[in-house]
Regions:
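Alpha-helical scaffold/interaction cores of sigma-54-like transcription cofactors
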Residues: 1-460
Length: 460
């Protein structure tokens, strides 16, 4: 009251606003965008006439072999989580169409008839996708990847992360890596015991990424597609410099204070209070006879960690069933790639999944642009039309380059440390490269010498 004695309405207005605030949850079940399924395959109305709620109850609460796996209470909870019977008709329609596309793709890849191993893998994965409520997600991803390849002439990466463990993704053309051949685990990607939205990172060539985003925006509608905001916060040194500038503290003194902050503090989180406790010179500055110095540290401690500015997530894009503004607050920003105005969610990435909005990751990869340019140069100068996905992975001359460590420009194989280990490993198979790529990470890196010794029989 004393602080705001001259403007008492500031307090009364604040209390009035507080009284009007109502609690509500932003959490929501996944809001899956609607994928346009050909009417000659089926419609929701047709499925309502064809299937009863009992049919859906059985299909969504039994395993892929028709065995009951949920008690009645758990089954009802699952159906409620998926959106009730009204939503189940849509999910079943999408799941059936997804199964058709997956089996059609499998027959093109593996031949017809399919082996029992392939059929069992596809049936299992499709069951998980359906009963988790995500078939529409895979239909959308395969659609824009197919458009990138066949309509837009954009290069698409062969696969990244856990999605490469899905045989359905492989048969749909989302990935180009056979998870059955390489014994990759589907459960790392989708697991009914760990309910979370699927997350497929898709690589496009740098120049083509904007074209794909434009295609997606045109297909689903500008009001239904948005990028994701990022919030930049004040780090310790930046907080000191920002406050010092407002305080009109001399630049030399501002730099001196900022440089006193260590890069890390043993066994403690790096923040200004801990830095002051750790550095005697900062303690002296906090007790300085100069009020500008004292106030700089005082206000920097208050502001440290607060939001300083906003940006746009490098690759995350939301595709919504409805207008984005029906679900989250948005702003606009200029899209650097398309030059057009774009919607940007005001919830950051860590919150978006809780709202039920579906995030797709569109990554621009310079390596793909280089490969695309190289293929075009081969066509122009040699008259050869190369399909990069059909080049043999058993070419001796290529392995010779890896053995010599000549991998500059090769994605994830170009660092000096990787080149050193490649020269020691002398890889001769694709599996050797897989192992080296998996091992060259902070956790297992110490085991690389043992792996190399065992390859060459120097260790049992």
């Amino acid at each position: 009251n004393e602080l705001f004695a001259d403007v008492p309405e500031a307090l009364s207005n604040t209390l009035e606003i507080l009284d009007k605030v109502e609690y509500y949850s932003i959490d929501h079940a996944p809001i899956m965008p609607t994928f346009a399924i050909p009417e000659d395959f089926g419609t929701e109305e047709g499925y309502r006439q064809k299937y009863t709620e009992k049919d859906l109850f059985d299909e969504f609460t039994q395993d892929e072999n028709g065995k009951v796996v949920l008690d009645e209470e758990a089954a009802k909870a699952k159906i409620k989580r998926l959106g009730g019977y009204e939503k189940l008709y849509r999910i079943k329609l999408e799941a059936d169409y997804l199964a058709k596309l997956a089996f059609d793709g499998a027959k093109r890849i593996y031949g017809d008839p399919l082996s029992d191993e392939v059929k069992e893998r596809l049936v299992f994965e499709l069951y998980i996708m359906k009963t988790m409520g995500f078939p529409g997600y895979f239909l959308i991803v395969q659609d824009f990847i197919n458009a990138a390849r066949t309509q837009l002439g954009v290069s698409v990466g062969p696969g990244r992360g856990s999605a490469a463990g899905s045989a359905v993704a492989y048969c749909l053309g989302i990935t180009k890596i056979d998870p059955i051949q390489y014994d990759l685990l589907f459960e790392r990607f989708l697991n009914p015991d760990r309910i979370s939205l699927p997350d497929i990172d898709v690589d496009f060539d740098d120049d083509g990424r904007g074209e794909v985003l434009r295609w997606v925006t045109e297909k689903y509608g500008q009001e239904k597609v948005a990028h994701i905001i990022t919030y930049g916060t004040m780090a310790t040194k930046l907080a000191i410099k920002d406050v010092a500038r407002v305080q009109k503290l001399p630049l030399s003194e501002s730099d001196r204070l900022a440089k006193l902050v260590p890069d890390k503090i043993p066994d403690k989180k790096l923040n200004l209070p801990n830095a002051i406790a750790y550095v005697p010179e900062l303690q002296a500055a906090e007790a300085s006879p100069d009020p500008l110095v004292r106030d700089t540290l005082k206000y920097a401690k208050m502001l440290e960690g607060n939001v300083r500015g906003t940006g746009v997530h490098a690759c995350g894009t939301i595709i919504c069933r409805d207008d984005i503004t029906d679900w989250v607050p948005v702003s606009t920003a200029d899209d650097k790639e398309t030059g057009e105005k774009m919607l940007v969610t005001q919830y950051e990435g860590s919150v978006i999944e809780d709202t039920g909005l579906i995030k797709m990751d569109f990554l621009g990869l310079k390596t793909l642009s280089i490969i695309k340019e190289a293929v075009e140069n081969v066509r122009l100068h040699r008259g050869l039309a190369l399909d990069i996905d059909k080049i043999s992975i058993n070419d001796p001359a290529t392995y010779k380059l890896y053995c010599d460590g000549r991998t500059i420009g090769t994605f994830q194989f170009e660092s000096a440390g990787m080149q050193k280990y490649l020269r020691e490993l002398q890889p001769g198979t694709f599996e050797d490269l897989i192992a080296m790529n998996a091992l060259y990470r902070p956790g297992p890196m110490d085991y690389i010498p043992d792996f190399i010794d065992r390859k060459w029989g120097r260790k049992p």
